[in-house]
């Protein structure tokens, strides 16, 4: 079970890092509303550019914490719970703008991975 947690925390972390560093300016097909990049997506949700960067910095920080958690297990659970909370928010934003369910697939996937990481990793021996 511990391996499920570790694989999940790595998967969630790499997914978030990929979105914020490799796909930031790309139209992925999963963007909210009619957005074609991250800035437009946050505008669709009614958030400012500053809010976008704050959310991004927090998500990236949580993703890094999940990776560091491979060596410092006690930080995994709080980081995973924090990331899961952001994914619940992302699901809410997709619903707010009336997106089809498929656009929520990445957020639902990271929510699932974060939940598994919180349950099966973080301080367990």
Mark where each language-model region is.
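Short amphipathic, positively biased membrane-proximal segments
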Residues: 1-125
């Amino acid at each position: 079970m511990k391996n499920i947690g570790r694989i999940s925390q790595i998967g969630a972390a790499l997914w978030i890092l990929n979105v914020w560093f490799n796909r930031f300016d790309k139209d992925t097909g999963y963007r909210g509303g009619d957005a074609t990049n991250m800035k437009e997506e946050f505008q669709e949700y009614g958030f400012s550019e500053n809010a976008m960067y704050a959310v991004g910095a927090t998500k990236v920080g949580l993703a890094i914490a999940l990776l560091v958690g491979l060596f410092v297990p006690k930080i995994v659970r709080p980081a995973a719970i924090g990331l899961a909370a952001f994914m619940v928010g992302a699901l809410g934003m997709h619903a707010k703008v009336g997106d089809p369910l498929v656009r929520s697939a990445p957020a639902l996937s990271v929510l699932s991975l974060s939940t598994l990481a919180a349950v099966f990793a973080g301080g367990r021996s």
